[in-house]
Amino acid sequence: MSSTHSRRIKFVSISVPILYGNHAIKLTPEKRKPTTPPEHTHEWTVFFKPVLGDIDLTPLIKKVTFKLHETYENPVRTLESPPYQVTETGWGEFEIIIKLHFQPGVELGINEKNFQIFHALKLHPYNPQAPQAQQPQVQQSQAQPPQQQFGGEGGSVGTVIRERENGEVHSVLYDELVFNEPTEKTFEILTSKPVNLIPYKLSNLDKRDQEYIRPDEIDELNRMDIYIDKVKQEIENQRNQYKLLEQEKLALLQ
């Protein structure tokens, strides 16, 4: 049975919409613990989850690891069951490596490569107009992150960074795990429920910054169309300017 389940289905791709990112909020005196370092300014939670909250990926995913900055004690955190998230405190922003480890095995018929994601931890709302001196400090790591290895292919739409009235910062990114020619067992797991359907409505209005719904994708595509038009217009402007310069050059040579 294992050899049958480990056979790959040719000319088939299946995707799983996912969300990953972090939530952060400034530390208040009430939230500080005796063990909290005095220089830490924020509490944050980094996470990975399927878009549809009722989808169980444990038959497919053995564990999820989060590689934090090397200055943290035990920088590689391992979670073998959902919720796949890590909560910590800190003062700086840095890159977190999220790695999905699939169930090992030809014996299970899964036999998929691990999937690695890089997430830039955000503690502050994004403000491109802020002066350089006011930009948040970043913890730097000497170690270079390993090369990305994909069990599927990513199709990220873009990071949504929002600040709520209470000061919480939410940096959430939509992506898709795409399995090309999955094994029969992987296909069976991923088709047991409609995992690739993005909901049209929020499960809870208070989770606006934590969920991804179909209108978000439509809004993002509309924004992309606007910027594509702007780029096309700029290319046309540059082309016209180049023609004028060429005409001026020819006039000077006559």
Curated annotation (Swiss-Prot):
GO terms for molecular function: chromatin binding; histone binding. The keyword DNA damage applies. Residues 218-254 form a coiled coil. It comes from the Eukaryota. Keywords: Activator, Chromatin regulator, Coiled coil, Cytoplasm, DNA damage, DNA repair, Nucleus, Transcription, Transcription regulation. Residues 128-158 are annotated as: Disordered. Pfam families: YEATS. Its main location: cytoplasm. The keyword Kinase does not apply. GO terms for cellular component: cytoplasm; NuA4 histone acetyltransferase complex; nucleus; Swr1 complex. Belongs to the YAF9 family. Component of the SWR1 complex which mediates the ATP-dependent exchange of histone H2A for the H2A variant HZT1 leading to transcriptional regulation of selected genes by chromatin remodeling. Component of the NuA4 histone acetyltransferase complex which is involved in transcriptional activation of selected genes principally by acetylation of nucleosomal histones H4 and H2A. The NuA4 complex is also involved in DNA repair. Yaf9 may also be required for viability in conditions in which the structural integrity of the spindle is compromised. The coiled-coil domain is required for assembly into the NuA4 complex. This is Protein AF-9 homolog. It comes from Candida albicans (strain SC5314 / ATCC MYA-2876). The gene is YAF9.
